[in-house]
Regions:
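Short N-terminal segments immediately surrounding and downstream of signal-peptide cleavage
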Residues: 22-33
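Stable alpha-helical elements in mature extracytoplasmic
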Residues: 41-45, 49, 72-76, 96, ...
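Positively charged n-region of N-terminal signal peptides that target proteins for export
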Residues: 1-4
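Sec/Tat signal peptide C-region and signal peptidase I cleavage site
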Residues: 15-20
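Hinge/capping helix and adjacent helix->loop/strand transition within the periplasmic-binding protein
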Residues: 30, 55-57, 79-90, 98, ...
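Extracytoplasmic "Venus flytrap"
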Residues: 31-46, 69-72, 153-160
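Signal peptide-proximal N-terminal region
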Residues: 51-63
C-alpha cells in the first residue's frame, strides 16, 4: 500500500497534464493516389483500402482514390514526392518495383525512394524467372556462362519483368536478352 501511495505522489503532477488530443483526421479527407489505371491490381488495392481504412484511423477521415497512371507508377511517385503537401493527407498505392527506377538511374525519377514512409503492403509478390526445359539453360550458372543468353520479355522499363533480369545481368553476370514491348 505504501508503494502505491509513494508512486501516486510522484505521478499525480503528470496525470493532470494528460488530456485528449484533438483528432487530426476528424473532418478531413485523405487522397489515396493509385499509380495505375482504373481496374488494375493496384487500383483495386487502393479502392479496398479506401473502403475500410478510414474506420480504423482516429477521426474517421473520408478516403478517396485518385488514379494517376503512367510510367509504371513513376508519375504518381513523382507527384507524391514533389507536389503533394507533406501533411499526411496524401498517400499512394504504387507498383513495388518503383525503387528500381531510382537504382537504374532513370532520368525521369524526381524522388528519393528511401525518404518515402512505408505504411504497409496489401500483398507480397514473389518473383520467379523460369525457362523451358528443352533449352540448354538448366541453372542460373548456365545463363551466366552462355555466349548468347536466353531471351526474356517485359511490358516496359518500369516493370519487374524488366528489372529482375537486368538486376541479375548487372550483379551476377547473367546474359538475359531483355525484349520490351
Amino acid at each position: 500500500m505504501m508503494r502505491i501511495l509513494f508512486a501516486s505522489f510522484f505521478l499525480l503532477p503528470w496525470i493532470s497534464s494528460l488530456h485528449a488530443q484533438p483528432l487530426f483526421y476528424q473532418g478531413k479527407t485523405i487522397t489515396l493516389i493509385a499509380g495505375t489505371t482504373a481496374g488494375s491490381q493496384y487500383d483495386a488495392h487502393a479502392r479496398l483500402i479506401a473502403q475500410h481504412w478510414g474506420k480504423h484511423i482516429p477521426g474517421n477521415p473520408d478516403i478517396i482514390v485518385q488514379n494517376m497512371a503512367g510510367a509504371g507508377s513513376l508519375i504518381a511517385a513523382n507527384h507524391l514526392y514533389n507536389l503533394a503537401k507533406p501533411d499526411g493527407l496524401t498517400i499512394t498505392s504504387i507498383i513495388p518495383a518503383i525503387y528500381f527506377n531510382q537504382l537504374a538511374g532513370r532520368k525521369e525519377v524526381r524522388f528519393d525512394y528511401p525518404k518515402f514512409n512505408w505504411i504497409g503492403s496489401v500483398d507480397r509478390s514473389d518473383n520467379v524467372i523460369y525457362i523451358r526445359s528443352d533449352t540448354p539453360f538448366k541453372t542460373i550458372y548456365d545463363v551466366r556462362r552462355a555466349t548468347q543468353g536466353p531471351k526474356c520479355t517485359a511490358t516496359g522499363t518500369g516493370t519487374i519483368g524488366h528489372y529482375m533480369p537486368k538486376l541479375l545481368n548487372e550483379t551476377i553476370g547473367t546474359k538475359f536478352d531483355i525484349i520490351l514491348g
